[in-house]
Amino acid sequence: MRCLSTLIGLLTATVTALAAEPQRATVVSIDQDKFCINGQLTYKGRIWNGHPIEGLLMNSRMVQATFDDRNPKTVARWAYPDTKRWDPDRNTAEFIAMMPTWRKHGLLAITLNLQGGSPEGYSKSQPWHNSAINADGTLDEKYLARLAKVIDKADQLGMVVILGLYYFGQDERVKDEQAVMAGVDNAVDWLIAQKYTNVLVEVNNETNVKAYDHDILKPDRVHELIERVKKRSVAKKHPLLVSTSYGGGTIPKPNVVKVADFLLLHGNGVKEPKRITQMVQQTRQVEGYRPMPILFNEDDHYDFDQPNNNCIAAVKAYASWGYFDYRIKGEGFDEGYQSVPVNWKTSSERKKGFFRLLSEITGEKP
């Protein structure tokens, strides 16, 4: 089984270093179109309503776990209702406190990003400064400290982190293409230095969104960065699994499919579950496709109490699905995981609905 051979290869490559440092608990690998954790297929043996769940990676977009705002003109927007001020360390601590609960419901992966995502859910402009990547491509130590706490906890829990590097609302914080590439290299080097084996790399969030400033982050050239991550990590004997994502309803392009290890789709704007099914089918027909995992790691459509919804449609098509929950206009603090400040508890009917369905599908009961 490729899962096991990949696991053995990675452990062999790092055995000398691991002898001197704590060994990581969680290793993610891929066996054709299936995910494995520690050499075993995820949700091993699970069948739900006649549909195989084994090998899927059910996930949730949680990019605000490491959020901060370096813009003094906007930071006050994120004040907590109780303290009337923003606190990035409190935010990360409260996130980590909830991770065991999510895992018990069957959540195996979370999506993070070194440049976050809109703290409003959707935004026309994004003046806040939420980036672990500095203008010259170096990395912010305070941001990395928060990120390490989250990835460490995921490792302890047997969870995977889908780590995005760039986001279209913040990539302008990096001055030029050389700095963009430096940011990629520094992120890869940091992951390897930390000995992380539970991380999947997402080069950038929604490469086809026109807001990107740097050409190398756009669809025609983003494969260059995927190849860069793979080449650099292999050279350092710590191969990383890499891809990028596309905006809602978009099918990956051949240049990405040919070089990616897995494929990331988004369901935002996809109102009919049958379109989710079509997206998976069409993705499997793209030039360069071979058996490889297909994941939705962002979808803001719910209807979790209905017999059919985007999540169920993805699972039936044998694609993993990712929950994206933001605070809709007029909603309060208890709603959403994307909107800052975040109540990371299962504090709304929407959140409860997702975790109920997730538990049912995966067979994992809290």
Predicted regions and their residues:
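Extracellular glycoside hydrolase catalytic/binding regions
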Residues: G183, V199-L200, N204-K352
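Bacterial N-terminal signal peptides
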Residues: S5-T16
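Cleaved targeting-peptide boundary
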Residues: A20-V27
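Generic hydrophobic-segment detector
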Residues: G9, S29-I30, L144
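Active-site mouth of glycoside hydrolases
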Residues: C36, Q40-T42, I47-A260, H266
